[in-house]
A protein has these predicted regions:
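C-terminal non-catalytic interaction/assembly regions of soluble proteins
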Residues: 294-456
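Small-residue-enriched flexible segments
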Residues: 2-10, 35, 77, 183-354
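Gly/Ser/Thr-rich loops at beta-strand to alpha-helix junctions
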Residues: 13-15, 40-42, 83-93, 177-183, ...
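Short, conserved secondary-structure transition motifs
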Residues: 109-127, 353-355, 412-422
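Short glycine-rich or small-residue beta-strand-to-loop segments that form or flank ligand, phosphate
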Residues: 53, 76-87, 172-173, 372-378
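An acidic, phosphate/nucleotide-engaging active-site surface
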Residues: 119-175
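N-terminal amphipathic/basic leader segments beginning at the initiator methionine
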Residues: 1-28
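N-terminal glycine-rich anion-binding loops that anchor highly charged ligand groups
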Residues: 29-46, 69, 74
């Protein structure tokens, strides 16, 4: 009898949700693994830098309750990658506390492995000095200042830490920052299934049913791996996998359609095929894993200031026609009044209805009949950001631009108060590869979780 391995991906990110009916149907197929890629760098550097999640706690707890309860009651491993959204120490602890609450409320007992992804700054400094760090495309070379200024530094772990935790008997594995497919692929590879097929399956399942048609990150998907390929399926009659949808998601967030790099290897898709089978299912084969020198992607973020912003609008055709000149004159006036002579204060305008999404790359040069104006000020302190934003906003509100007819305010504000304090602003300070000779150097520990708490 042909062997297979069933991987259930309930949702694209913990907290995004999924229909209970889809999850119930998936569980009737007796999955061998429940896994979720719980985070992403897509929401930007703030969440890594601030050590905060970008998903709602209640939503994350709801999703985890289904997953942990079903996994423990049916003796199915539950593997979570990039816990808490960014996978640094505070994110891992945040997710751990939620799981402890679920165990108490659902009267569950299980062993849980915690795999931090944080990297000591001293290790990064030494690697930089030894020439063991390289920048990714379009990223400047790493500096010692960038390392020191980063609030958290994490490395994207591969499959090996997950495998080691599972080998030591963990029922639930809670990992820090991880390569997206790793949490899906670790166990099937450990059980002897082809690494290329398992990694490709994980690449698609990382976003759950987004790869189906119509796609949704808030619905379940399953990958069934065998010795020759894997089958993709959903559990919602509204969604189906197609050859096109599965192939398209394989290219998701990738610059090369044939070679997808990861920790310790490259996924070679030159011989990959997608074939529709049954009703709404797709069979994928031909994916190959090729070993490369082991490297891990480092991510770090540092604080660069504080933000204050204002949202406003105008539909005056005279103002819209001259908006670029008006903005330049307003900036000049404010800079003169505040004696701004350094680069520590940044004043930006985002003009929705003109080029708010693409900026200078916008090919359509004709503005609409109205503009949504987002004024964004970043300064060294919150107080300075507030003051500059207030002055820019009031200056633009009453600015006497060329051919102006009205003498009242130039802007319409949807909210009162108009100015919004955005708090600390972060930027990615580290987005580099570090050579790693030991793929298993992510330390982890296993704790026994019970309804009464953690047992030593």
């Amino acid at each position: 009898m042909a062997r297979s391995f069933k991987v259930l991906s309930p949702t694209a990110i913990l907290g995004y949700g999924f229909p209970e009916e889809s999850f119930r149907k998936a569980m009737t197929e007796s999955p061998d693994l429940i896994a979720v890629d719980a985070g992403s760098s897509d929401p930007g550097p703030h969440y890594l830098g601030a050590g905060k999640p970008f998903t709602d706690r209640a939503g994350v707890k709801r999703d985890l309750r289904y997953m942990i309860t079903a996994g423990v009651q049916n003796n199915i491993p539950v593997v979570i990658g990039t816990a808490g959204g960014s996978g640094a120490a505070p994110h891992l602890e945040w997710c751990r506390e939620i799981i402890h609450e679920i165990a108490r409320e659902e009267h569950l007992s299980f062993s849980m492995a915690l795999i931090p992804a944080d990297v000591d700054k001293a290790i990064v400094h030494q690697a930089l000095d030894n020439g063991k760090i390289t920048a990714l495309d379009f990223v400047p070379p790493l500096t010692h200042d960038a390392i020191d200024e980063s609030t958290y530094i994490v490395a994207q772990m591969g499959i090996e830490p997950f495998q080691q935790a599972l080998k030591e008997g963990a029922q639930v594995v809670l990992g820090g920052r991880a390569y997206d497919p790793a949490c899906f692929a670790a166990l099937p590879i450990m059980q002897g299934f082809d690494e290329g097929l398992a990694m490709h399956c994980g690449k698609i399942l990382e976003c759950a049913a987004i790869a189906a048609t119509p796609g949704s990150g808030s619905d379940c998907a399953m990958g069934i791996i065998d010795d020759n390929g894997f089958t993709l399926k959903t559990f919602n009659p509204k969604r189906k996998f197609t050859e096109t949808s599965a192939a398209a998601h394989t290219l998701y967030e990738k610059s090369d359609p044939y070679f997808l790099p990861g920790p310790g290897g490259v996924l070679n898709l030159k011989g990959c095929t997608f074939k529709a089978v049954n009703d709404g299912e797709v069979y994928v084969s031909g994916s190959k894993h090729e070993e490369t020198p082991y490297a891990l992607k480092l991510e770090g973020a540092r604080r660069v200031g504080f933000r204050c912003l204002t949202i406003a609008g105008t539909r005056d055709p005279i103002m819209i026609a001259g908006i670029d000149k008006i903005i330049d004159e307003v900036k000049t006036s404010v800079s003169r009044n505040l004696s701004l002579d350094d680069d520590s204060i940044h004043i930006n305008f985002h003009l929705y209805g003109k080029n708010g999404v693409m900026g200078d790359h916008e090919p359509m040069q004709t503005a609409g009949h109205e503009l949504g104006i987002v004024l964004d000020v970043v300064a060294p302190t919150q107080e300075i950001a507030n003051s500059v934003c207030s002055l820019v906003r009031s200056t633009m509100l009453h600015y006497g631009y060329e051919n102006r007819i009205a003498t009242a305010g130039n802007l319409a504000f949807p909210f009162s108060p108009s100015d919004i304090q955005g708090g600390p602003v972060y930027e990615f300070s580290i987005y580099h590869l570090i050579e790693a000779n030991d793929a298993l150097r992510f330390d982890f520990h296993i704790e026994q979780v019970t309804p009464e708490g953690v047992q030593a």
